[in-house]
Each structure stands twice: as C-alpha cells, then as structure tokens.
C-alpha cells in the first residue's frame, strides 16, 4: 500500500512586507513622510534617502508604473494599521442578547458561575437576559426571584447597567442588563457617612429675645 499522506502541521509562513532591501524594482516613484513627491529615482538612491532620515522605504503600490514607495516609520505605520483594524472589528460587532438562566433557590457556586457567564457576555459587548425559571408552585416565590435578580444587578454594576428591571414574563422572572457605557462612579463610604450625619443634625433652635 502507498504511504498515507502526512499533514503538515507547521504554521503557514507569513508573507513579509515589501520594505527596504526586499524591494527589487530598479526605478521607484517615491513620496516622503510629509507627502512630498521626490519623483522617480533609482532604488539605491531611494534607500539612501530613507537611511539618512532613519526611516523605512515601504512599497505601497506595486501595480503602478513605476511602483510607488513611501518613506515612513514602518513600525509606527504597522501599529496604526493594527489599531484601525481592531477598531473596525469592534464597531462591526453585532450586539446579541445572551441569556443566563437559574432557579430562585440557587447555591453560591452556581450563582458565581452565572455571574462569570454574564461578565464574559458583557465584556464581549452583548446584552444579558437574566432569567429565573419557576416550576409548578414555585411561581408564588416571585418576590425571592426579584431579590435574586437585584442582587445580580448589584454584583454586576461595574460592567453593566440595568436596561429593564425585574418583571414577570409568563412563568419566569426576567431582567435585562446592558454593557455600561461610562465607568461607574462609586461614592466614598466616609463621604456617605458624613452626608448622612449632616442630614440628621437638627437645625439650631431660633433664639427668642426676651428683652424689652
């Protein structure tokens, strides 16, 4: 029998950018870092100009005649391109509604698991539907389910804000959370204590002038 073909598991070779000595065209149309046209010059001359300015010669249009190169900081250019690609990918993300289901009698471990799931969904930019499922006569414990959902909203207040507070939906109790747009600003506990104390201090009694 012929030997079975072996799969090449090596990572694919990444195509190297056409910069500096990897540019093989003898004549190039060159643009400097400020966008100024340097005209059509020899490859060696273009490389020399780039070296003098401590920058890179980058091929930007291979199909042009002659090919067009630009003198630039390639490391900075690559960083900006990757940054733009990440921002474009982030903007193209379609917001989805992810659901986290639980019973109103949930133990701490399972509750922590649901919190972790919700945090991952919110971090990905998705909304979260928190659902408490009732079975049979459990429907009479909607108050406990509401307490559970409000506890979850409190535990997730940093990455999320409540889009829809707890409410009945059929035989379930639901709540919607959405990723928080602005960072949560928490009041300092000492400040809250002081403010509370100030509110409870009675106003001084008005003096009555008994003199004639």
Curated annotation (Swiss-Prot):
SUPFAM superfamilies: Translation initiation factor IF3, C-terminal domain, Translation initiation factor IF3, N-terminal domain. IF-3 binds to the 30S ribosomal subunit and shifts the equilibrium between 70S ribosomes and their 50S and 30S subunits in favor of the free subunits, thus enhancing the availability of 30S subunits on which protein synthesis initiation begins. NCBIfam families: infC. One of its GO terms (molecular function) is ribosome binding. It comes from Synechococcus sp. (strain CC9311). This is Translation initiation factor IF-3. Gene3D superfamilies: Translation initiation factor 3 (IF-3), C-terminal domain, Translation initiation factor 3 (IF-3), N-terminal domain. HAMAP family: IF_3. PANTHER family: TRANSLATION INITIATION FACTOR IF-3, TRANSLATION INITIATION FACTOR IF-3, MITOCHONDRIAL. It is found in: Cytoplasm. InterPro entries: T_IF-3_C_sf, T_IF-3_N_sf, Translation_initiation_fac3_CS, Translation_initiation_fac_3, Translation_initiation_fac_3_C, Translation_initiation_fac_3_N. Monomer.
